[in-house]
Amino acid sequence: MITADSRAAATALLEGALVIIPTETVYGLAGRADHPDAIGRIYAVKGRPSSHPVIVHVADPDLDASRPGAWVSDVPDYARALAQACWPGPLTLVLPRSDRASDAVTGGQDTVAIRVPAHPDALAVLRAMDELDPAGAPHGVAAPSANVFGHVSPTALDHARADLADRLAPGDLALDGGPCEVGVESTIVDCTGAQPRILRPGRIGAADIERVTGMAVLDASSSGIRVPGAMPSHYAPAASIALAPDPAALEAYVDAAIVGGTQADAIGIIAMEGVPTPEGATRLLAPASADDYARGLYDALRRADATGIAFIVAVAPV
């Protein structure tokens, strides 16, 4: 059932139901993070491997590891600085877990991924959970993307319902918060070492992190931490995709696809506004900015699948 009532959504979550909630990145399939049955249902509904960790979403950006109910056990100064600068927002921090963070949430690792979403509806739900059950505060929800595992992430409620409506139980809810503002998943940063390490790229980049922390940012190459959204099957449409490095290369990619047997009208183009669409191809997205590119990308990939596009050429935004 679709609802606009954040308190109804919070009540459902506290009772162990699942709720599709909007965030600024993508829609999430939320379940109470300290409720093992709810976490188990998230994995079952999505068809997600149980070894794959989920992100705990909370309303309070205070990363005090000493307070009762904390999800983390240790917070370095640079992680605290990132939280203060970037939360609420599309940044997930990986930190040493507390006893409250179960193996179901962490994928059996000794770390937990945590963030404060920036969407007002998501924050309203989380705050309502704390108000309705203050003894259990600070509450958190696990909220991986509200889609079948491996499919393109949903940036509108219709996307999520198309994937999950027939998999949810009668007591589960969906909260419509409109289109997602960012449109791609949060940046994930490992904060368990002496320096921050990006484990998954997103809206917040290395330069942003360096500016806040004053530290060089490491890449994920030497990290053994499993994180959400980092498997090869993630975010994949049915169509094949090629990434053209610049607009000048677009025609060559399209020509190669046609020579390989793909009909021109089954080729989809994602490129910045002003980049011409090759003759016969289908334009999927023509954004005016890099932010618009990110915001519209997943919707374009879903439309490609819905319209029978077999091959997509995406020109990198420059």
Regions inferred by a protein language model and the residue ranges of each:
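Active-site-adjacent structural elements in enzyme catalytic cores
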Residues: 1-318
